[in-house]
């Protein structure tokens, strides 16, 4: 049996280690494989990265024997400690086979929902993963424009987008993608992609770019938090049933939200919480615990909510 990697938070959530943390993950995060065949400029697992192989984003991952990891996750689900499992699959020659085996093993634990975030290349491969028991599939765009995709990730954004759309049409409401803010796109470019995803029932997990030692982008800065807040607000308003046109621009920047009493509409703070698949909270995935959070993994305090509104800098009507 192979070694799996559990995020440190997951190891705490399933009882494999003791952690002092204000909130444990509600999803069990598993990394399958290491040393990716791709060469994304922001990723610790990239082909040319010199980062330690135990990292993905700023999270450390702990090697665990496969059988032990499956048992701990399954029992934690049965005990109500986690809501689902998420397989973060590194693109390697045997990655598809690893996922198929993992899905087969998780079936031993009944109704445990398993999300697979991987690099399948055809609708038929996606169908096989669903047939094997995946609850949802994630196919990461990461980057908002074809030009940036080619320079940062390599390959064709259009091909990835067309595959994502084809899967969303065949498996409506069961597809997720990740988008990373701060890779050189404008707010308008990111907003356009978010809206196109939402129209197709593709769930968006919004991330803030995180510079990592050993990657090509190690010296780049994280995104402006105000820009990130504005995109979070727009995404939340889509979820609440508002039209995309309520988000207004001057040039490439969001400057106004055309919603009466918009701050009352957003008073629940959900706009600034972690986005993506249901029950995914990703504690401290984008920032250190002492930093102001891009994505809050828990309800915001009144002070945090006030700060997030102020950071956005937008006006309502």
Say what each PLM segment does:
Residues 97-114, 156-174, 224-244:
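Alpha-helix-loop-beta-strand connector modules within alpha/beta enzyme cores
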Residues 164-188, 208-209, 214:
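Conserved strand-turn element in the central/C-terminal portion of the radical SAM core barrel
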Residues 1-10, 261-317:
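Radical SAM enzyme core and accessory elements
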Residues 24-35, 248-275:
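Immediate flanking context of iron-sulfur cluster ligation sites
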Residues 147-153, 184-185, 203-228, 241-264:
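Flexible glycine/acidic-rich beta-alpha junction loops that bind and position SAM and/or redox cofactors
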Residues 122-132, 181-200:
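Catalytic cores of alpha/beta
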Residues 1-63, 72-75, 271, 283-285:
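N-terminal [4Fe-4S]-dependent radical SAM core
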Residues 47-96, 107-125, 134-162, 176, ...:
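Core AdoMet radical
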């Amino acid at each position: 049996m192979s070694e799996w990697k559990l995020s440190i938070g997951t190891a705490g959530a399933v009882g494999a280690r003791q952690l002092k943390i204000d909130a444990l993950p509600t999803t069990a995060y598993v990394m399958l494989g290491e040393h990716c065949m791709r060469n994304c400029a922001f990723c610790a697992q990239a082909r040319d990265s010199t980062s330690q192989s135990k990292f993905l984003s700023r999270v450390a991952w702990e090697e665990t024997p496969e059988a032990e990891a499956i048992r701990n996750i399954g029992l934690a689900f049965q005990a109500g400690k986690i809501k689902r499992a998420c397989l973060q699959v590194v693109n390697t020659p045997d990655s598809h086979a690893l996922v198929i085996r993992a899905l087969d093993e998780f079936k031993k634990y009944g109704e445990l929902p398993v999300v697979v975030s991987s690099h399948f290349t055809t609708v038929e491969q996606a169908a096989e993963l669903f047939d094997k028991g995946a609850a949802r599939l994630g196919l990461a765009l990461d980057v908002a424009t074809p030009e940036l995709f080619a320079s940062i990730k390599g390959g064709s954004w259009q091909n990835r987008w067309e595959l994502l759309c084809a899967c969303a049409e065949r498996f409506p409401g069961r597809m997720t993608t990740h988008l990373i803010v701060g890779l050189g796109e404008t707010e308008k470019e990111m907003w356009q992609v978010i809206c196109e995803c939402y129209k197709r029932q593709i769930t968006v997990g919004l991330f803030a770019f995180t510079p990592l030692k050993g990657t090509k982008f190690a010296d780049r800065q994280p995104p402006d938090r105000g820009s990130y807040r504005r995109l979070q607000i727009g995404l939340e308003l889509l979820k609440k049933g508002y039209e995309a046109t309520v988000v207004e621009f001057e040039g490439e920047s969001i400057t106004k939200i055309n919603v009466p009493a918009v701050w009352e509409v957003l008073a629940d703070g959900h706009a600034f919480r972690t986005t993506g698949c249901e029950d995914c909270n990703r504690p401290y995935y984008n920032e250190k615990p002492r930093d102001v959070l891009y994505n809050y993994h828990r309800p915001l305090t009144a002070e945090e909510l006030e700060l997030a509104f102020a950071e956005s800098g937008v006006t309502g009507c």
